[in-house]
């Protein structure tokens, strides 16, 4: 679900203080975008939203969430309706819970 090697790599690249800011910004922006996913939007907007979410997720190691976003992005690109937008939200919530729980342990070590 989470690529911890990517998380560690990013934290080492930017430092602990900046990493905390990046995590806070990521969670806020992604949560907001996920909450506004709507199957009634034009496919081009859904594709754009899922592309943004995928890229953001990959930067912070949310691989399962990113993979689901990628699946939806491809469907939207090819004119297919992606009916799993609820799964995208669920995947984000599950990933977020795991990430925050494990991150506390990782930082404490």
Model-derived features: positions:
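Two-component system phosphorelay core
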Residues: 1-48, 52-109
């Amino acid at each position: 679900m989470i690529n911890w090697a990517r998380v560690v790599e990013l934290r080492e690249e930017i430092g602990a203080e900046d990493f905390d800011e990046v995590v806070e910004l990521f969670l806020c922006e992604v949560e907001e975008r996920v909450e506004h996913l709507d199957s009634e939007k034009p496919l081009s907007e859904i594709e754009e939203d899922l592309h943004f979410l995928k890229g953001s997720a990959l930067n912070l190691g949310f691989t399962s969430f990113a993979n689901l976003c990628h699946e939806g992005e491809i469907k939207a690109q090819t004119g297919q309706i992606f009916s799993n937008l609820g799964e995208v939200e669920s995947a984000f919530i599950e990933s977020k819970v795991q990430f925050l729980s494990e991150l506390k342990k990782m930082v404490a070590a």
